[in-house]
Every structure is written in C-alpha cells, then in structure tokens.
Curated annotation (Swiss-Prot):
This is Lysine--tRNA ligase. Pfam families: tRNA-synt_2, tRNA_anti-codon. The gene is lysS. It comes from Leptospira borgpetersenii serovar Hardjo-bovis (strain JB197). GO terms for molecular function: ATP binding; lysine-tRNA ligase activity; magnesium ion binding; tRNA binding. It is found in: Cytoplasm. Belongs to the class-II aminoacyl-tRNA synthetase family.
Length: 495
C-alpha cells in the first residue's frame, strides 16, 4: 500500500500529465444547473429521456472501472448520485481522464438520467471535466451492517481540519446547517416581536457587561488600550436610554478564559432588551423563544439529548438560587454568616473554594459542581444574590437579592436575564464595590464605567434584559456534547 506522500506525488503527476495534454486542471468556470437530490426526486415522479440533460458539480465519491464502462458516485451539497460513463459516449481522451480521477476530485458532469436494472436512478455521463484535483487523499468512510469504518474520527484533527470534516462526515454538515436555521429563526422571531437588530462596538475602551477577563489590544493612531468586548450589554442599554424600546444584537463575544466542552474564548451571544419591562417579561420571552425553536427544528417539544428525553413544554420549573443549592448540597447559604463557615461546608463536599473571597462566591462554586450538572429538565433559577449580579435591579421584597434568572437545560446554563438596574446611584456603588474586588485580585470583576453612569443619569425606563448563548443553544437542539461541535473553527493550540 502506498503511503500518503506517494499518493500525493502520484496525484501531482496527474496534474502535470493533464497540462502536457493542453488541459487546464483548474478551469476558470463551470456552472451546474442541478443538484443531485432534486433531479433524483423529480425523476422518480416524472422520468425524462436522453434529450433532457443535467449539469452537476461535486466530488467523486467512489469509482469502479470495468474496461470500456465505469460506474461511480458523485457527492454534492444535497446528496449522492450514481454515475455511468463509457468510452463510446465520452471518447478516448475524456474517458481516459474519467478513469484517472481520484476520490475527492471535484468534477463537472453533464448527462441524462436513467434507471439501472436494480432500480437506481443514475446519470449517464456525456461529458466530464476535472475542476480541482484532490491532491491530499480524503479519509474513506465505509459502512457495513450499520457500522462505520475508517471515519475521520480523531476529534482534534476534525476541529483543526474542519474542511475535511465537512466533506467526510455528513452529520457535521447537518449540525451547521441546523445552526444556521436556528440563528435565522431567532432573528425572525425577535423581528416579529417588534425588536430592532443593532450593532454595537466590538472594541471597547472599558470591558463591561459581564464578569470575565478580556482580550487586550492597542489602537496605534489613538495610542489607547482597547478590549475585545466581553458583552454588548452596556451599549445596548445606552440605546434604551436613547429611546430605542426593543433592541437585540446577535454577534460575537470574546473572553480570555479557559477552554472546555462548555466554553470557547470566542462565542456567539444574543442579547435583547425591552423598555418598560422586567425579569418576568424576559422569562416569558425566553420560554416562548426556545419552545418556538424546538418546534421549528424538531417539530416537537420533547427532544432527545444523549440518554435524556428533555421536555421543553411550558411552563418550566422555577426555583430560587439558594433553594436549588440546598436541594443538591444540603447547604443553606442564606443562613451562613461567615466566609470561614461557607468554605468549611464546601470543603466537606470536596468543592475547591480556595480562591473564593466571599460567601456567595463559595456558594457559586458549590452550585456549579453540585447543582448544575443535575439540571437536565428545563428550569429557571431565580432570585440571585446581589453580590453576583452587579447590573441587576434589587428585589424590593427580598433584601440582598436581585430580580434575575438563568435558564438551565441539559445540565448547563443557556442564558441570563434580569430586571435591569436603572438607578445611577446604586449602579455607581456596585461598580465601586467591583473595583475594590478587582484591586483585591479578582481580574474578572467589573471596571468602573463613568459614561454608562452618565447615560443612566439621563434616565432609563424600567427595562428587562436577556442574553442567550447561541452555541450552547445549538448544542441542545443538535444533540451535540461539546461546544466545539457547534463552532466551525474553534480555537486550538498550535500544532
């Protein structure tokens, strides 16, 4: 068996051979007029004769040469179609080119349809043209008795070489087609709800809107430090101040943090804000949006995610932040009065809280390890501690807590929402508290944003805000178990 380097050299030689025959192996243009799936389906219903020609373009998927005649398969973006080519139809030169084709070569074909004795709709090829040589051999995926062999399955290679992954693994292509549908449906849904889609800065002088470490860059002309945005929140709320009552943005955020099955430093977020609304407005919107997406993508509200059947039917369960922690850990953090006591109880559960410097940060670690993985069915976690929510409005009926919720499904958070804090004095105090935490070593604490305070001083109406992680939502709706499976080109270490 030839190794890959020898195969590559053979294929390069075939390119040279074509050039020596005066044939351009990379022609300027070829315009298909049909897709394989469409013409097969139409032919099954209404057969056509040799007078009806079709032009197809795609990759050579398989080939079986039998002297003066050959069978092959072409794969395009819609599916696979069988090909039948003969020396008599193509002529000596073209048939020789057809026989020399390698799997993965991109070719253009013209021909008419017929059915073989086995009943398979087949393109009888009347002309063939090499459009681009597949110099590097593709992995050959074979299936026998329902078992897949030789798949391009190395996860790291798949992520690094997504272009090969998409060619070889149809389910990967399907995931990203579904992702595109989800994004389109979100835009349609929000537009129909009266939202205006806007764009806010990707480079910001102050990294705000979330507790996260930013990526830092520098603008040479202005000689100023800038941050890739960690969230668009503070700019979107400036628009609410300006009288734009319903706005949303669906775009990228960047956070200089770890990489895991749930985190990628570059990710897609949808944030929406409604003036004269509150947390409950956004809770209703979240429930309606996600059930709408499930119906559009799956045609049902019960969807399979791994071994779990998830029922998205409304209404979703609601439970407070402290109660859900107590349910899964036995600790009632609302009764704990010292950091030492909080750390002791967390340590008894083998939760590492060595870097936590407040009671509620200890609680959040316990929540992440003990409660979150168990939140399989959809649930809204409500009534978060004020300390963990610097931009949310205080709950007037529950001192020390805010009007905030996070939706959880399949063991992970998929969003964050609250009644927005619109009191500039309260907001400034919370920013100042965050600055103190930052100076104490918390590099994820918020920075002071004086301009945002100034915007609030002009008056912002009671407002509801919502953020939904698109990548995690796609994970849920495509039964994907790593965020990298929903991002075309996830960040990777250098090879």
């Amino acid at each position: 068996m030839l190794d890959s380097n020898e195969l590559i050299q053979q294929r390069i030689q075939k390119i040279e051979d074509l050039k020596n025959q005066g044939i351009n192996p990379y022609p300027v243009r070829f315009f298909p007029d049909s897709k394989s799936k469409d013409i097969v389906e139409k032919f099954e219903k209404d057969p056509t004769g040799p007078e009806t020609k079709f032009k197809l373009g795609g990759r050579l998927h398989s080939k079986r040469v039998m002297g003066k005649a050959s069978f092959a398969h072409l794969k395009d973006s819609t599916g696979i179609i069988q090909l039948y080519a003969t020396r008599d139809d193509l002529g000596e030169i073209s048939y020789s080119i057809f026989k020399s084709l390698d799997l993965g070569d991109i070719i253009g074909l013209e021909g008419y349809l017929f059915k073989t004795q086995k009943g398979e709709v087949t393109l009888h090829v009347t002309s063939v043209e090499l459009l681009a040589k597949c110099i590097r051999p593709l992995p050959v995926v074979k299936e026998k008795d329902g078992v897949i062999y030789d798949a391009f399955a190395d996860v790291e290679q798949r992520y690094r070489m997504r272009y090969v992954d998409l060619v070889v693994n149809d389910h990967v292509r399907d995931t990203f087609i579904t992702r595109s549908r989800i994004v389109s449906e979100i835009r349609n849904f929000l537009t129909n709800e009266g939202f205006l889609e806007v764009e806010t800065p990707m480079m910001q002088p102050i990294a705000g809107g979330a507790a996260a470490r930013p990526f830092v860059t520098h603008h040479n002309t202005l000689d100023m430090q800038l941050f890739l945005r960690i969230a668009p929140e503070l700019y979107l709320k400036r628009l609410i101040v300006g009288g734009m009552d319903r706005v949303f943005e669906l775009n990228r955020n960047f956070r200089n943090e770890g990489i895991s099955t749930k985190h990628n430093p570059e990710f897609t977020m949808m944030e929406a804000y409604i003036a004269f609304a509150d947390m409950n407005t956004m809770l209703d919107l979240t429930e309606r949006l996600i059930t709408h997406l499930a119906q559009k993508i799956h045609g049902a509200l019960k969807i399979q995610y791994g071994k779990d059947l998830i029922d998205l039917s409304p209404p979703w369960r609601k439970i407070t932040y402290t109660d859900i922690i107590k349910e899964y850990s036995g600790i009632d953090f609302s009764l704990i009065t010292s950091l030492e006591e909080a750390k002791k109880k967390a340590s008894e559960l083998n939760v590492d809280v060595s870097k936590c410097n407040t009671i509620w940060k200890v609680a959040d670690e316990v929540f992440s390890e003990k409660a979150e993985p168990n939140l399989i069915q959809p649930v809204f976690i409500i009534d978060y501690p004020k300390e963990l929510s610097p931009l949310a409005k205080s709950n007037p009926d529950k001192p020390g807590y805010v009007e905030r919720f996070e939706p959880y499904v399949a063991g992970r958070e998929i969003g964050n929402a609250f009644t927005e804090l619109n009191d500039p004095f309260d907001q400034k105090e919370r920013f100042e508290d965050q600055v103190q935490q930052r100076e104490a070593g918390d590099d994820e604490a918020f920075m002071m944003d004086e301009d945002y305070i100034r915007a609030l001083e002009y008056g912002m109406p009671p407002t509801g805000g919502l953020g939904i992680g698109i990548d995690r939502l796609v994970m849920l709706l495509t039964d994907s178990h790593s965020i990298r499976d929903t991002i075309l080109f996830p960040l990777m270490r250098p090879e």
